[in-house]
Amino acid sequence: MDDNYLDSIFEKYLHAKKIFKNKEVLRHSYTPRELPHRREQIENLAHILVPVLRGETPSNVFVYGKTGTGKTVTIKFVTEELKKISQKYNVPVDVIYVNCEIVDTQYRVLANIVNHFREESGVEVPLVGWPTDEVYSKLKAVIDAKERFVIIVLDEIDKLIKKSGDDILYSLTRINTELHRAKVSIIGISNDLKFKDYLDPRVLSSLSEEEVVFPPYDANQLRDILMQRAKDAFNEGVLDDGVVPLCAALAAREHGDARRALDLLRVAGEIAEREGASKVTERHVWKAQEKIEQDTMEEVIKTLPLHSKVLLYAIVLLDENGELPANTGDVYSVYKSLCDHIDLEPLTQRRVSDLINELDMLGIINAKVVSKGRYGRTKEIRLNVTPYKVKNIYRHDHQLQTVLTISMSRQRRLL
């Protein structure tokens, strides 16, 4: 392949009709100037945090709602506004945002908070290696170095609690009793209301001093959000009239997920740009929907536990053998043989039945209970993804290299 060929490709895409004015406006990380349909939540949060401006410690807040209901962007919006107005009143405020999906251990959360003040304190905690008690002592020291209010936002707090327990919350919600100059307030954000069941009652009462609920958006509200972003994201006249309503309607089916709506609009624009189209049409939205679903399914399969991956491969082998739909017993038999083949201790049939239900809930397989008349009821299992897709994902998973070498004969012997 010569350089001229590549040059011509780059030139072609560079000089194609420009769809986007500012694509970043459609990213999840972008904080807009206005937040449609979240005035009630903004006012609630402002009311909870306003004591800061009077020199008083605000309550801890627990914020919850499903994915894409505007929790994170609203918290960022309100805390950024608080920081601006606090300067006017000469009240020092620090806001520390921690994504607990990534920073998911007690040690790393504490280190993250300490390192927020590294330029001021000269203290930097490594990602591993120090005793946790020492990190906590450093945290208290750097926060309490001067009079100020520190608001710690723990986003996806449920991920942290499920992985590492609630000791860190116990410490942070009581830290003010150990400080002399600074005051700390916690904002916990969760997609999962049930996660409160994991908390010690004392932690729960401290964290949930105030609660703010974010309900799902409906299709009309999603349309307003997209219209607002589209003005800044796209060049004038490039969106067909039906594009935004379709993105909103599709995302409304996904429990009113604004993130999904923004992704649909962005990916539809990217597809149109790649095609060299002068406009984004509804056809591009449907293509975007298909691409996002494929990407989501790939991510779901990649993050399955090992036994679920082996179980899925058993169903793949049955599919390649022309034996789907299969019942639970047939699937378990092949799964057990695979485990024996790769020296993995098999789970019980009852546990595998639970894993089948989980794969069904994730949409990777379809496990439908059907009546066989006088023979009773049985579960018929089918694949919802192609064997090629599963194998392609497994090809990059070092744990499953051995599994990929296995095929199955018509007599269900593994080869």
Curated annotation (Swiss-Prot):
One matching Pfam family is Cdc6_lid
| Keywords, sorted A to Z | ATP-binding, DNA replication, Nucleotide-binding
Q: Where is the signal peptide?
A: none
Record: residues binding ATP: T69, G70, K71, T72, V73, Y217, R229
Q: Biological process (GO) annotations?
A: DNA replication
What does the record give under GO molecular function?
A: ATP binding; ATP hydrolysis activity
Q: Give the record's family classification.
A: Belongs to the CDC6/cdc18 family.
HAMAP family (alphabetical): ORC1_type_DNA_replic_protein
- Protein role: Involved in regulation of DNA replication.
Which NCBIfam families does the protein's record reference? Answer: orc1/cdc6 family replication initiation protein, PRK00411.1-3
User: What name does this protein carry?
Assistant: ORC1-type DNA replication protein
The root-end lineage is:
Archaea, Methanobacteriati, Methanobacteriota, Thermococci, Thermococcales
